[in-house]
């Protein structure tokens, strides 16, 4: 009797599990449809792939000292810089993150890469390719499955020749393979063979940014976080860099493109996430930027009006409503 009871219970459990799986699949499919109703760039191959990178309810605060108080009497306080932030990058797409300076775009990049300051408090959930990540997991991904194109060229080691630095981003390859890969990328970005022997201080600003792009692409990552990758590049090279991101995404990878250049972003992105005051105020399809009536947030509409093709037509009142304040008050001292 016990064996039969167990068999019956197992059958009931299997039936319940099957029903739950079907319900989950239907819900997941419905959610996927909601996520993928948007249109894409003309060159996009994105057709509703799964989440490669998913951030949910991200909150970041810093423990600061009140700089207005006398030095030895300053009290600590928590300054919230990101709050309730959720964003996702699907396989095969580019998500452009735009917004005013100080809106939290670079802090998002730091959080995704697990680059946490000692005085920071970070809560929320981050998944990479379906796997929940902790700080250790994000650290292991950096430079491999997840690559950064940093905002500042100071990320280059001033004491190491450029060629060796770039090749160091693909240690899994043989020495000959690393060299061949680096030479291929250098040729792509107009960097001559002699650049490999230069030190970072011998590079122009544009050359240094191209070197950073090569570093990010060396190890064939699944997701690239590009933090302002085009300043210092002339228009042709900037377009080529973004086209490479588009090709990278079309191969089933993902790009989180953080930029102030909305025009270039709209050229290659699938979706745009608009940042203001430490969170995403609107996430919309690129096609919706063709008509401000399709944009729901006043700040997003202000960005639309400020585009050159609209004659920088943002009014003073709109600008005042849409302006983003600095996130950390007066550059307070860290704890």
Kindly give the residue locations of the regions a language model identified.
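C-terminal boundary and immediately downstream tail of ABC-type ATPase nucleotide-binding domains
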Residues: 2-3, 36-40, 191, 291-335
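ABC ATPase NBD coupling module
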Residues: 132-147, 172, 289-295
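Q-loop/switch helix immediately C-terminal to the Walker
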Residues: 158-171
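Conserved ABC ATPase "signature" region
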Residues: 179-194
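Conserved ABC ATPase signature
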Residues: 199-203, 207
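ABC ATPase C-loop
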Residues: 211, 216-217
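A short, proline-enriched helix->beta-strand linker immediately N-terminal to the Walker B motif
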Residues: 218-222
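H-loop/switch region of ABC-family ATPase nucleotide-binding domains
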Residues: 259-260
């Amino acid at each position: 009797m016990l064996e039969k009871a167990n068999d019956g219970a197992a059958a009931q459990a299997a039936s319940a599990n099957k029903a739950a799986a079907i319900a989950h699949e239907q819900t997941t499919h419905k959610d996927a449809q909601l996520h993928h109703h948007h249109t894409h760039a003309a060159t996009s191959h994105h057709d509703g792939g799964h989440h490669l990178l998913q951030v949910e309810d991200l909150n970041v605060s810093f423990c600061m000292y009140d700089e207005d108080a006398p030095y030895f009497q300053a009290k600590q306080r928590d300054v919230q810089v990101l709050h309730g932030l959720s964003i996702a990058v699907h396989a095969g797409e580019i998500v452009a993150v735009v917004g005013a300076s100080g809106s939290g775009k670079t802090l998002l990049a730091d959080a995704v890469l697990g680059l946490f300051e000692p005085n920071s408090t970070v809560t929320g959930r981050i998944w990479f390719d379906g796997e929940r990540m902790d700080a250790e997991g994000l650290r292991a991904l950096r430079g491999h499955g997840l690559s950064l194109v940093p905002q500042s060229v100071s990320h280059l080691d001033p004491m190491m020749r450029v060629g060796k630095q770039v090749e160091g981003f693909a240690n899994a390859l043989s020495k000959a393979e690393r060299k061949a890969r680096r030479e291929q990328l250098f040729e792509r970005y107009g960097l001559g063979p002699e650049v490999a022997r230069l030190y970072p201080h011998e590079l122009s600003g544009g050359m240094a940014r191209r070197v950073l792009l090569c570093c990010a692409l060396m190890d064939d990552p699944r997701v690239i976080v590009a933090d302002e990758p085009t300043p210092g590049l002339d228009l042709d090279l900037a377009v080529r860099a973004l086209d490479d991101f588009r090709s990278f995404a079309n191969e089933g990878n993902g790009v989180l493109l953080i930029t102030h250049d909305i025009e270039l972003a709209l050229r290659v992105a699938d979706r745009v996430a608009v940042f203001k005051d430490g969170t995403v105020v609107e996430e919309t399809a690129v096609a919706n930027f063709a008509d401000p009536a399709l944009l729901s947030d006043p700040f997003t509409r202000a960005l639309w009006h400020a585009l050159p093709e609209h004659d920088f037509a943002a009014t003073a009142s709109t600008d005042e409503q849409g302006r983003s304040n600095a996130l950390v008050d007066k550059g307070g001292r860290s704890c």
